[in-house]
Amino acid sequence: MLGKYPDKIKQLPLYDGRFDAYKLMAKGSDVLFASYPAGTHIPEHTHDTDNHGVITRGELILTMNGEVTRVKQGEWYHVPANVEHAATFEVDTDEIEFWFHE
């Protein structure tokens, strides 16, 4: 069901949110091993964490500050805290997200 992750990752607790992910909690941050099926769209939203992510399979179409950026496999992106953004996934996509609490 969730991404192509090693068995140790698949033993982590599941994230209880609007997408599928395994969640690793650490002091001051969370690490999510997320999977998005093709056709997923997450509408504009904000959050109070400073987010960095790397695409490990597929592609993220990130809309932020009126600009659309395609983030491909192996590439990193950054979404600052409290900035409106949206995400679209045209193909099955896995990513590792780092959420840093302010």
Regions of interest found by a model, annotated:
Residues 30-47:
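Conserved short histidine dyad/triad with adjacent acidic residue
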Residues 49-60, 65:
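Glycine- and acidic-residue-biased ligand/ion/polar-headgroup-sensing regions
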Residues 1-28, 32-33:
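A short, N-terminal "cap"/entry segment at the start of jelly-roll beta-barrel domains
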Residues 66-81:
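Short acidic-glycine-tyrosine-enriched beta hairpin
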